[in-house]
C-alpha cells in the first residue's frame, strides 16, 4: 500500500508538472537570462586536467589514479555527467557514497572537481515506467514520414520537454547540487552534456510549436501570408490545421521549426541553470559543454547568457593534419559568445573516433602544443577526454591519457611535461584578452535555409543528393583564410546591435535577414566600415520568402549593383586574367550571380563566352566605407587572396602576414596587463622567424627576446613572448 501511495503521489506530481509545462510551452524562451554575479571566475592560474570516470574502471584503483594525476600535475577533473543510473538506481532512491569517495580523494590531493548534471542519459527504470520520454525523432523525407521511435540503449534519446522527464531531472539535480553545495573541492557545475534538440518531434513538442506560432503570428491568416501558404493550397484556417513538421514543404515552416528546436534547447539549459543556482554555492560557477560550435539546432549565443562561463569540446586533426585551424574556428566562436574567456572541457588525449578506422595518435609535441593553442585563444582550462581508455562499447577506441593497460605512456609523459610548465607560467597565461579588428557574421537561419534550398548538390536534377558545398563550408573557408593570414577574428550575430568595433566585417551568404539587419550593415559601410560579402546575401527575408524587389534587396545601394539572374556552374571556371595572381587557384565554382554594376566597380570577370559579360566580384564605395561582393564561390586560394586584398585596404596587415605558412601567431593581453605573443610551428621541420614586437621574455625558457630577434621553433613547438620584464622566476628547473 505504501509503495502504491508513493507511486500515486509521484504520478500526481508529474501530472501537475505536465499542466505547468503545457502552459510554459506557449511561451518562448526568455529574451534574457542572467548569469550569476557571484561565481568565482578569477582563476589565478590555468586549470589543467581530464574527465575521470572511476565507475568505468575494471578494478579498484582510485588511489592509484589520483596519485598518477597528482604526479602528472593535473589540478582539475570533470566527473559525473553520465551517471544517472548510479545516482538513482531506483525511482526515488539516491546514493552518494560512490561519488563522495572520489570527490574526497581528489580534494585531499588538491585536485578541484567540476560535476555534471547527469541528465543526458536516462536510467532504464525511467524508460520502462515512462516510454513517452523516449524521443520520436524527426523523419524528414520529400513526401513526409512518421517520426522514428527511439528505444532504450543509447544516450540522448529523450524528449527534454517531457513533463515526466523534467520532474525526474529536477528532483535529481536538486539532490546532487544540494549535497555538494558546501564541498570546497567542487568548484563548478556542468549542465547536461553536449545538449541538442535530438530531433525530437514528440506530440508535446509539436503542441508547443503550435502555441509558439500562435503567440508569434497572432492569427492563422498572418501565418498564411508570412509563409506564402496559398501555394499548393496549404493555407490553414485554425491552429489545429497546422501539419506536423515531417510532411511540411513550406520553407517558412521549416525555418521556424529550427528556431523552435533551438529555443527548446535554450529553455532546457536555462531551466537547469536556474535549478543549479537555487541549490549551489555562489562560489561555484555554472557552465555547459557545447559539443563543438555552429550547430543548426543549438543557439549557442542565447544559451551563453545563462552561463557564468561557456565551455566547448574541441576535437581536431593529428599527425600531419595537426595545424591549429580547428581549434581556431571553434574557439574564436566560443570566445565571441560572451566576449570572455572560456573552458575547454574536452579535447584529444590520444586517438579519437567511434571505430578503429580513424586511429592517428599525435606526434611527439602535438599534445603539448595543443594545450597552448587553446590558451592562446582565451581558454582558462584545458581538459582531456578522458583519463583512461574504455575497455568496451561505443567509445572503445576514443582513447584517454592512459591506454587500456592503464600504465604511464608517451601521452602521460607529455602532459606531465606540459603541466610542469603550466605550474610555473600559468599565472601569465590565464585570463588572456584578445582584441580582434575583424568579425565574421554568423547566421544560423542562413545555415538552415540554404540547407533546405542548397546551391551545390551531388547528382543531377531531382536527385536531392547531399550538398557538396553549403553555408557552413563557406564560413569555414573564409575563417580558414583569415587563419592562414594570421588575422584574429571574432564572430558577430544577427542580433549584434552594431559592428563599429571592427574595421572589417565578413558576411558569408546572408540568405536570411530582416530589413533592420540589412540597414545596420549598410550604415556600418556608410560610416567607414569595410565589408566582404558573398553571393545569396539579402535574397530572402526573415520568413525565408524571397523579397519582391531586385536583388540584393535592401543592400542594393550599399552594394552598388543589382541582379535578376543566376546560374549553377557545372564545372569550375577561371576569372579573366588571373586578377589576384593565384595561378592554379584562379577558379570559381557552384554558383554565379549575373551582377549588373550601378555604382560598383567590377573587380573580376568570368572567363566564359556567355557569363563573361557579368562581373564575378565587385567593389563599391559607399559613404566612407567599401563593400566588396563575391557573386560566386571562390576557390580556397582565391578566397585567401581576396581577403588579403581587403585587409590591406583596411590597414590590417603587417609583419604577421610575412611569416612562413606553418607558423601561426596569436596575440593578447594577460591578467597582469602585459602583451603576450604566441608563435606556433605546426610542422615537423624546424623554423626560424623574426620576432616583430617589443622586447620581452620567452616564458617557456626564461630567456630574453629582443625586437627583431630570431626565434628558433623546433618541430611541433612554440614560443610565448611576454613583453617587458617578467615578474616571476621562469628559469626551467
Where does each model-flagged region fall?
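Short, acidic/polar
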Residues: 56-71, 171, 175, 292-303, ...
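Polysaccharide-binding and catalytic clefts of secreted carbohydrate-active enzymes
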Residues: 136-309, 313-326
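N-terminal carbohydrate-binding accessory modules
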Residues: 26-78, 89, 104-108, 112, ...
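Bacterial N-terminal signal peptides
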Residues: 10-19
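Carbohydrate-binding surfaces of carbohydrate-active enzymes
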Residues: 239-242, 270, 282, 315-733
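Aromatic-lined substrate-binding rim segments of carbohydrate-active enzymes
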Residues: 63-72, 76-143, 174-177, 272-280, ...
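The substrate-binding groove and active-site-proximal loops of carbohydrate-active enzymes
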Residues: 48-57, 82-97, 151-170, 192-199, ...
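Conserved, mostly hydrophobic/aromatic
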Residues: 50, 69, 77, 106, ...
Amino acid at each position: 500500500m505504501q509503495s502504491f501511495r508513493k507511486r500515486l503521489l509521484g504520478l500526481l506530481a508529474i501530472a501537475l508538472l505536465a499542466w505547468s509545462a503545457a502552459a510554459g510551452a506557449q511561451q518562448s524562451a526568455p529574451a534574457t537570462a542572467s548569469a550569476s554575479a557571484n561565481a568565482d571566475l578569477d582563476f589565478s592560474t590555468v586549470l589543467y586536467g581530464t574527465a575521470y570516470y572511476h565507475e568505468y574502471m575494471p578494478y579498484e584503483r582510485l588511489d592509484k589514479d589520483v596519485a598518477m594525476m597528482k604526479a602528472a600535475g593535473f589540478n582539475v577533473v570533470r566527473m559525473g555527467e553520465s551517471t544517472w543510473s548510479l545516482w538513482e538506481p531506483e525511482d526515488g532512491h539516491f546514493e552518494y557514497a560512490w561519488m563522495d569517495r572520489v570527490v574526497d580523494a581528489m580534494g585531499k590531493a588538491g585536485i578541484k572537481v567540476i560535476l555534471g548534471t547527469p541528465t543526458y542519459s536516462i536510467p532504464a527504470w525511467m524508460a520502462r515506467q515512462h516510454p513517452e520520454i523516449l524521443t520520436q525523432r524527426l523523419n524528414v523525407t520529400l513526401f513526409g514520414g512518421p517520426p522514428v521511435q527511439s528505444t532504450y540503449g543509447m544516450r540522448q534519446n529523450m524528449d527534454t520537454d517531457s513533463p515526466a522527464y523534467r520532474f525526474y531531472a529536477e528532483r535529481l539535480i536538486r539532490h546532487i547540487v544540494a549535497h555538494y553545495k558546501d564541498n570546497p573541492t567542487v568548484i563548478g557545475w556542468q549542465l547536461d552534456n553536449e545538449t541538442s534538440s535530438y530531433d525530437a518531434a514528440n506530440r508535446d513538442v509539436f503542441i508547443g510549436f503550435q502555441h509558439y506560432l500562435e503567440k508569434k503570428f497572432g492569427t492563422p491568416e498572418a501565418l498564411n501570408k508570412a509563409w506564402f501558404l496559398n501555394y499548393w493550397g496549404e493555407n490553414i484556417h485554425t491552429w489545429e490545421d497546422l501539419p506536423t513538421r515531417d510532411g511540411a514543404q513550406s520553407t517558412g515552416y521549416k525555418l521556424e521549426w529550427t528556431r523552435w528546436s533551438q529555443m527548446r534547447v535554450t529553455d532546457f539549459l536555462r531551466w537547469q541553470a536556474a535549478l543549479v543556482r537555487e541549490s549551489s554555492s555562489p562560489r561555484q560557477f555554472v557552465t555547459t559543454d557545447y559539443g563543438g560550435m555552429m550547430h543548426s539546432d543549438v543557439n549557442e549565443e542565447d544559451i551563453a547568457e545563462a552561463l557564468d562561463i561557456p565551455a566547448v569540446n574541441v576535437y581536431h586533426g593529428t599527425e600531419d593534419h595537426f595545424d591549429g585551424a580547428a581549434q581556431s574556428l571553434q574557439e574564436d566562436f566560443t570566445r565571441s559568445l560572451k566576449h570572455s574567456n572560456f573552458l575547454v572541457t574536452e579535447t584529444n588525449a590520444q586517438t579519437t573516433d567511434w571505430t578503429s578506422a580513424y586511429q592517428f595518435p599525435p606526434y611527439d609535441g602535438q599534445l603539448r602544443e595543443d594545450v597552448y593553442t587553446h590558451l592562446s585563444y582565451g581558454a582558462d582550462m584545458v581538459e582531456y577526454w578522458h583519463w583512461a581508455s574504455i575497455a568496451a562499447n561505443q567509445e572503445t577506441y576514443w582513447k584517454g591519457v592512459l591506454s587500456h593497460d592503464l600504465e604511464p605512456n608517451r601521452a602521460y609523459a607529455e602532459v606531465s611535461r606540459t603541466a610542469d610548465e603550466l605550474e610555473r607560467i600559468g599565472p601569465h597565461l590565464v585570463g588572456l584578452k584578445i582584441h580582434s579588428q575583424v568579425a565574421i557574421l554568423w547566421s544560423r537561419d542562413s545555415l538552415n535555409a540554404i540547407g533546405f534550398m542548397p546551391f551545390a548538390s551531388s547528382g543531377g536534377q531531382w536527385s536531392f543528393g547531399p550538398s557538396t558545398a553549403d553555408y557552413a563550408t563557406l564560413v569555414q573557408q573564409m575563417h580558414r583564410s583569415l587563419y592562414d593570414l594570421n588575422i584574429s577574428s571574432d564572430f558577430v550575430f544577427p542580433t549584434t546591435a552594431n559592428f563599429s568595433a571592427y574595421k572589417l566585417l565578413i558576411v558569408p551568404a546572408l540568405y536570411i535577414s530582416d530589413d533592420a539587419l540589412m540597414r545596420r550593415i549598410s550604415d556600418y559601410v556608410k560610416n567607414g566600415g569595410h565589408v566582404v560579402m558573398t553571393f545569396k546575401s539579402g535574397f530572402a527575408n526573415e520568413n525565408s520568402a524571397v523579397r519582391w524587389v531586385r536583388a540584393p534587396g535592401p543592400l542594393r545601394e550599399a552594394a552598388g549593383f543589382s541582379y535578376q539572374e543566376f546560374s549553377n556552374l557545372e564545372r569550375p571556371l577561371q576569372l579573366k586574367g588571373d586578377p589576384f595572381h593565384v595561378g592554379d587557384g584562379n577558379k570559381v565554382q557552384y554558383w554565379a550571380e549575373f551582377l549588373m554594376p550601378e555604382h560598383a566597380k567590377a573587380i573580376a570577370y568570368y572567363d566564359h563566352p556567355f557569363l563573361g559579360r557579368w562581373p564575378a566580384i565587385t567593389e563599391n564605395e559607399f559613404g566612407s566605407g567599401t563593400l566588396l561582393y563575391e557573386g560566386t564561390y571562390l576557390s580556397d586560394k582565391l578566397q585567401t587572396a581576396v581577403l588579403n586584398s581587403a585587409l590591406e585596404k583596411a590597414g590590417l596587415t603587417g609583419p604577421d602576414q610575412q611569416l612562413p605558412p606553418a607558423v601561426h601567431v596569436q596575440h593578447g593581453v594577460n591578467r597582469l596587463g602585459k602583451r603576450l605573443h604566441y608563435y606556433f610551428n605546426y610542422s615537423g621541420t624546424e623554423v626560424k622567424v623574426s620576432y616583430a614586437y617589443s622586447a620581452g621574455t620567452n616564458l617557456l625558457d626564461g630567456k630574453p627576446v629582443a625586437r627583431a630577434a630570431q626565434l628558433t621553433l623546433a618541430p611541433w613547438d612554440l614560443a610565448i613572448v611576454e613583453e617587458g620584464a617578467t615578474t616571476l622566476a621562469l628559469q626551467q628547473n
